[in-house]
Amino acid sequence: MCKLEKFNYALFGNPIDHSQSPKIHNFFATQTGILHIYKAINIPLDQFSSVVSDFFKKNIKGANVTAPFKKEAYFFSDKLTERAKIAQSVNTLKKISDKCILGDNTDGIGLLSDLVRLNFIKKNFSILILGAGGAVKGVLLPLLSLGCSVYILNRTILNAKILVKQFNKYGKIFVFDRQNFKQQNFDLVINAMSRNTEKKNFLPLSLITSKTFFYDMNYSTRNTPFINWCSKAGGSFISNGIGMLVFQAAYSFLEWHNVLPEINYIINILNIK
């Protein structure tokens, strides 16, 4: 584990070896000239609260949180932004005072910003989301606020129903039952399952058209199974989630420093399409 005195911002997760966040935040620091020294820390699964508490007792100002600790970060926070309250998930922590840690969630605005950049979304789109885990909670509100109809396809239907019940007051959200569905076409398909999920058929081909957009919230130096499936299925508009990562990182940076980095510059540096 890195010594806490060596940096003032961090990413907490398990595992974090694959993370691009330190590279992105180093770009932000160089671009803005702000003292922003950012490290990734792998936390044992049963030590989140103790490690993070120790972190904030030092002269430390903020942290990002990734899987599997976003729910724990939600309960760890002394104060929450409205979007974090709704998501019941936190990916950004900010030290307000010695007695107050603010929890925020920038995943939703990060996803929406990247979808807009790619021209993958419009008002009232019909969207199918694959998965009903914690990653989905953080991104639903911006999609629903845009007037989109969101359908949740999950292996365990009960989990999808719980998610729909939590968010149906914010917009049009439904459970998609793969075994019993009415024929329809989706404008956008978002994969929110694990990047290592291997499937021969992520969804029925009858649900997509040549104009359907495909977005994988995961990112990797290699194509994920979902990206490969989309290509084989004939998808023409496909993107992984590294753009979302850059945007959510930028909005975390904004939370900490009141400065929004020039995001397209970072995207170009990372050669993101």
From Swiss-Prot:
What UniProt keywords are attached to this protein's entry?
Answer: Amino-acid biosynthesis, Aromatic amino acid biosynthesis, NADP, Oxidoreductase
What pathway, per the record? Metabolic intermediate biosynthesis; chorismate biosynthesis; chorismate from D-erythrose 4-phosphate and phosphoenolpyruvate: step 4/7
The EC number(s) attached to this protein equal 1.1.1.25
> Has the keyword Amino-acid biosynthesis been applied to this entry?
yes
Please cite one Gene Ontology biological process associated with this protein. chorismate biosynthetic process
Catalytic activity, as annotated: shikimate + NADP(+) = 3-dehydroshikimate + NADPH + H(+)
Q: Where does NADP(+) bind?
A: 82, 131-135, 217, 241
Q: Which molecular-function annotation in GO is an example for this chain?
A: NADP binding
| GO cellular component annotations of the record | cytosol
Q: What InterPro entries would the database entry show?
A: Aminoacid_DH-like_N_sf, NAD(P)-bd_dom_sf, Shikimate_DH, Shikimate_DH-bd_N, Shikimate_DH_fam, Shikm_DH/Glu-tRNA_Rdtase
The enzyme's first-digit EC class, named in words, is oxidoreductase
**Binding residues for shikimate, per the UniProt record?**
19-21, 66, 91, 107, 219
Active-site positions, per UniProt? 70
Give the PANTHER family listed for this entry: BIFUNCTIONAL 3-DEHYDROQUINATE DEHYDRATASE_SHIKIMATE DEHYDROGENASE, CHLOROPLASTIC, SHIKIMATE DEHYDROGENASE
Q: Which HAMAP family match?
A: Shikimate_DH_AroE
Protein's job: Involved in the biosynthesis of the chorismate, which leads to the biosynthesis of aromatic amino acids. Catalyzes the reversible NADPH linked reduction of 3-dehydroshikimate (DHSA) to yield shikimate (SA).
How it assembles, according to the record, is: Homodimer.
Q: Read off the NCBIfam families from this record.
A: aroE, PRK00258.1-2
Family statement = Belongs to the shikimate dehydrogenase family.
Q: What is this protein called?
A: Shikimate dehydrogenase (NADP(+))
Q: Which organism is it from?
A: Buchnera aphidicola subsp. Schizaphis graminum (strain Sg)
